[in-house]
Amino acid sequence: MTTNPKPIYQRILLKLSGEALQGSEGFGIDAKVLDRMAQEVKELVELGVQVGLVIGGGNLFRGAGLAEAGMNRVVGDHMGMLATVMNGLAMRDALHRAYVNARVMSAIPLNGVCDSYNWAEAISQLRQGRVVIFAAGTGNPFFTTDSAACLRGIEIEADIVLKATKVDGVYTDDPVKNPDAVLCDKLGFQDVLEKELKVMDLAAFTLARDHKMPIRVFNMTKPGSLRRVVMGEQEGTLIS
């Protein structure tokens, strides 16, 4: 049952992990998962919600792992940024096939492949009802795509950052290791820091906190969950 006839958010920043796109595959992009996610985003656009997207790159490349093996961290992070561009292009294509207008904006210039990130242009595109996919993270090494999601969310003045994961939200403890772990409905930023709960990395989290950007962590593998979040139904954990 929908509690609100209209969406409670006008503009959102949706953060998808790269792993979410690989579905049951061990690597790469699962076309079925990609198309399902594109359909869920399409539903939001049809509701009149403006959607900014940040996608991770972990399904294609993990810089941290190779850094441990001796690769220069900056090089690894640059490769990771390019992985997010590949995911962004795949998502744009899936959205176009679903008849949704979408643009990819990269934090590093890639002429002929996608647009370079431009704040004013991004706002203009969102207002026109286009989905804007922000690729290549922040454009800087040592910053995660969670940091990019919070940064872009703050820049475009989104109402909320929605972090789509494989778990139902934030638990009091690791639910895999501790069967008594409880799912939290609402948390304050300070609660998360004091209890050291895993929401996102500290740089991203403190950026959101300092700019009073609420975050909702929810399970996107459940069909319809994204729509439920936007319609104001209880789904996942709200941090504000």
Swiss-Prot record:
Residues the entry annotates as binding UMP: 57, 77, 138-145
Record's keyword annotation contains Nucleus: no
Keywords tagged on the record: Allosteric enzyme, ATP-binding, Cytoplasm, Kinase, Nucleotide-binding, Pyrimidine biosynthesis, Transferase
Pfam families documented for this protein: AA_kinase
Keyword set includes Nucleotide-binding: yes
Catalytic activity: UMP + ATP = UDP + ADP
Binding site residues for ATP: 15-18, 58, 62, 165, 171, 174
Subcellular location: Cytoplasm
A single GO molecular function term of this UniProt record: ATP binding
GO BP annotations, alphabetical order: 'de novo' CTP biosynthetic process; UDP biosynthetic process
Pathway named in the protein's UniProt entry: Pyrimidine metabolism; CTP biosynthesis via de novo pathway; UDP from UMP (UMPK route): step 1/1
EC number(s) on file: 2.7.4.22
GO CC, any one term: cytosol
Gene3D superfamilies: Acetylglutamate kinase-like
Activity regulation as described: Allosterically activated by GTP. Inhibited by UTP.
Job of this protein: Catalyzes the reversible phosphorylation of UMP to UDP.
UniProt record similarity statement: Belongs to the UMP kinase family.
Matches recorded under PANTHER family: URIDYLATE KINASE (PTHR42833), URIDYLATE KINASE PUMPKIN, CHLOROPLASTIC (PTHR42833:SF4)
Assembly and interaction partners: Homohexamer.
HAMAP family: PyrH_B (MF_01220_B)
Listed name of the protein: Uridylate kinase
Organism encoding this protein: Photobacterium profundum (strain SS9)
